[in-house]
């Protein structure tokens, strides 16, 4: 009978010539692409973030490699990254056997929050140079992501303004009482104007000085009156502190209607993930991204719950980052406003953006309402509409409305002459008097142009691509990579965190495309990222920043 033999097992055996760590890493592992990408990026701007004195810090390239590779593998916790630096051979190789703790990793992320955007921009230039993207087509969409803040830490603008108004009334009443008792002639004569915290502090100081100047007395009634005066001054001090609190709330709110006490950068908005089905608002951010070939080409956070007001600032961000605007923009109906259409037309951007009711118009059974203003016949030369009964509706004026962004829309108003006794009045309209319609001719023109583009062959292609561009990125981000909630407090730190995620997402997507094409990652890494062209890209970045600073100046 043959004797059973096992392979030698000596876990404590020493090796005379230690092997390289990466010998046990697969040739097509994405960690090699991460290493090649970061090695060939220019991180000179990171040096200004460190002090020349003190203990030598960890190399920023090593820290950047470890964090980005962790984000690629759905690891966002600094403590988990620290554990992998001791256990996982991929992290050990990237870190070069260094072992930064979780505090060091977190401090590094916070330290580079101003410079990480340049790293993202350099990566996009690399992707554009190698043909993964062109920066000509921008598919834009947004999603609401919940903040780290607690749920019930809301501060509402209307509540603050209402309570502040009530506080002003209390201050005026109290000052009138104090004026009667102390009779200050210099400071509190006029109580009709609105008080500020500084003015209220001056009044409190003057009242205290007036009380100190009063002679001491042993009379019981006078002592009682003096205690009452001091109580009124203390009450006035409490009102002053409350006024300062309300003013701080309004300063933090800015143009928003709400914010969270534990995350002042977050705004309360309704999320899609509503477990209670009651429309409860939660603190969060409106994340807007631009994609091309499922790569994230730009991103920005907004406090607006809707997407309409985010498009133009997003284009400004794109132009500041790349010193250019895209040639084509693809987006859903949430961005289809007159202001957005006009901006894109003036800047030479071909807009494949839907408007409200576009899908409804494309249904086979759709029949337009014959009494709707858009269905009425319009004579452009003489500027009048014809109602279903054939009478003219002449123009009577122009209505101007101002949007939340300050844009002014103009709507022409047309009025019928004889609606009384009309047999179609019940179907046409139900208000009293003659019918008046309001028509925005400029917006209707933009809608006609958008309809022609969307129904063209190119428009159908872009409409089909839109569903698999930003929507696919959001799906991978939330469900495949478990990035459903921000883990930092403050807009600057949240932006930093998503910048790390966007870099990791793009590298991961690039690796997936290369593997799908059958290319070996180790072979691609040898020629894909050469340090020669990085200087040109950094010059472009510096030029963008310089042009922006000159424009602001």
Q: How would you label these PLM feature ranges?
A:
Residues 8, 56, 67, 74-87, ...:
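Anion-binding and metal-coordination hotspots
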């Amino acid at each position: 009978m043959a004797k059973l033999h096992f392979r030698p097992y000596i876990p404590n055996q020493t090796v005379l010539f230690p092997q390289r760590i990466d010998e046990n890493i697969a040739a097509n592992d994405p960690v090699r692409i991460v290493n090649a990408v970061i090695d060939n990026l220019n991180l000179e701007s990171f040096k200004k973030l460190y002090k020349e004195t003190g203990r030598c810090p960890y190399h920023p390239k090593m820290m950047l490699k470890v964090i980005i590779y962790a984000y690629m593998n759905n690891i966002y916790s600094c403590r988990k990254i620290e554990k992998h630096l001791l256990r996982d051979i991929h992290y050990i190789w990237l870190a070069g056997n260094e072992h930064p703790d979780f505090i060091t990793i977190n401090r590094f992320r916070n330290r580079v929050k101003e410079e990480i955007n340049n790293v993202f921009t350099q990566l996009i230039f690399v992707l554009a140079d190698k043909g993964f993207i062109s920066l000509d087509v921008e598919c834009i969409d947004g999603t609401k992501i919940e903040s780290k803040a607690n749920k019930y830490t809301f501060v509402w603008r209307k509540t603050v303004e209402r309570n502040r108004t009530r506080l002003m009334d209390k201050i005026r009443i109290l000052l009138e009482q104090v004026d009667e008792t102390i009779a200050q002639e210099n400071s509190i004569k006029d109580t009709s104007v609105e008080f500020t915290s500084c003015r209220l502090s001056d009044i409190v100081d003057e009242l205290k000085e007036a009380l100190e100047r009063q002679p001491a007395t042993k009379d019981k009634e006078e002592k009682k009156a003096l205690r009452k005066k001091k109580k009124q001054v203390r009450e006035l001090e409490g009102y002053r502190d409350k006024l300062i609190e309300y003013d701080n709330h309004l300063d933090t709110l800015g143009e928003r209607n709400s914010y969270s006490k534990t995350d002042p950068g977050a705004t309360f908005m309704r999320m899609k993930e509503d477990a209670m089905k009651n429309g409860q608002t939660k603190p969060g951010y409106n994340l807007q991204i631009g994609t091309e070939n499922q790569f994230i080409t730009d991103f920005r956070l907004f406090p607006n719950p809707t997407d309409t007001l985010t498009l133009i600032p997003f284009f400004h961000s794109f132009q500041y980052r790349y010193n250019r605007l895209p040639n084509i923009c693809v987006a859903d109906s949430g961005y289809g406003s007159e202001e957005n259409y006009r901006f894109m037309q003036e800047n030479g951007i071909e807009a494949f953006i839907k408007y409200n009711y576009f899908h409804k118009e494309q249904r086979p059974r759709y029949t337009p309402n014959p009494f709707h203003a858009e269905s009425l016949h319009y004579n452009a030369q003489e500027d009048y509409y014809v109602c279903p009964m054939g009478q003219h509706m002449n123009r009577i004026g122009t209505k101007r409305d101002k949007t939340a962004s300050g844009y002014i829309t103009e709507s022409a108003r047309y009025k019928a002459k004889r609606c009384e006794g009309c047999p179609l009045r019940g179907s046409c309209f139900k208000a009293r008097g003659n019918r008046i319609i309001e028509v925005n001719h400029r917006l209707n023109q933009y809608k006609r142009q958008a309809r022609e583009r969307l129904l063209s062959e190119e428009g159908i292609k872009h409409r089909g691509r839109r569903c698999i561009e930003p929507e696919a990125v959001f799906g991978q981000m939330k469900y495949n990579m478990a990035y459903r909630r921000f883990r930092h407090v403050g807009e600057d730190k949240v932006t930093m965190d998503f910048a790390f995620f966007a870099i990791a997402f793009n590298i991961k997507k690039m690796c997936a495309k290369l593997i799908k094409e059958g290319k070996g990652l180790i072979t691609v890494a040898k020629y894909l990222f050469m340090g020669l062209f990085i200087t040109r890209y950094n010059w472009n970045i510096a030029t963008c920043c310089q042009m922006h600073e000159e424009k602001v100046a």
